[in-house]
From Swiss-Prot:
Protein name (record): Bifunctional protein PyrR
Protein family: Belongs to the purine/pyrimidine phosphoribosyltransferase family. PyrR subfamily.
Organism annotation: Haemophilus influenzae (strain ATCC 51907 / DSM 11121 / KW20 / Rd)
A Pfam family this chain is assigned to: Pribosyltran
Alphabetical list of CDD domains matching this protein: PRTases_typeI
Catalytic activity: UMP + diphosphate = 5-phospho-alpha-D-ribose 1-diphosphate + uracil
GO-annotated biological processes: regulation of DNA-templated transcription
């Protein structure tokens, strides 16, 4: 069973709202960089970057972050001798003394974010890391909390939350899949 909880229009309104929140929280955007976790987090980061630029005329430096080898669940990912493929980060971005806006699609256990923070250290020591999550579904296993949340969606552990993006899925929407 599938239930659409965010449609295309609401998806883009959520991007706009989060962009406004980022701008409002910072007196200046000069030391901000935006980093999206591949794949859907990176596409959401790109949407946020474009919207922030539309609103402020400032183009935030950005990159896509591949956390493949920083994950602590590689043995779970490695099914039937299929090793995960590291595609690399889109570019090198020096984050030394910058405020990093880290973006991902769904916050669940917190393990992906922990892996992303580990991966970020390869790019310098950030002054601060702020977290943007499009959907927070709860069930944390690590003490991770988002600074900006598109939507809080209480779920059961059996349900799956899918954030669908144009490049990956051909549309912008969020669905819950369950029994």
């Amino acid at each position: 069973m599938e239930k659409i909880i965010i449609d295309h229009d609401r998806f883009l309104r959520t991007i706009s709202r989060i962009s406004h929140e980022i701008i409002e929280k910072h007196q200046t955007l000069d030391d901000l960089v935006i980093v999206g976790i591949k794949r859907r987090g990176a596409e959401i980061a790109e949407l946020l970057q474009r919207r922030v630029e539309e609103l402020s005329s400032i183009n935030l430096p950005s990159m896509e972050l591949d956390i493949t080898f920083y994950r602590d669940d590689l043995t779970l990912v490695d099914q039937e001798d299929k090793m995960p493929v590291y595609s690399g980060s889109s570019q090198y971005l020096n984050i030394q003394d910058k405020t990093v806006i880290l973006v991902d699609d769904v916050l669940f256990t917190g393990r992906t974010i922990r892996a992303a923070m580990d991966a970020l250290t390869d790019f310098g020591r950030a002054a601060k890391i702020e977290l943007v999550i499009f959907v927070d579904r709860g069930h944390r296993e690590l003490p991770i909390r988002a600074d900006y949340v598109g939507k809080n969606v209480p779920t059961s552990r059996d349900e799956l939350v899918q954030v669908r993006t144009e490049k990956q899925d051909g549309c912008y929407e969020v669905a819950i899949l369950g029994k």
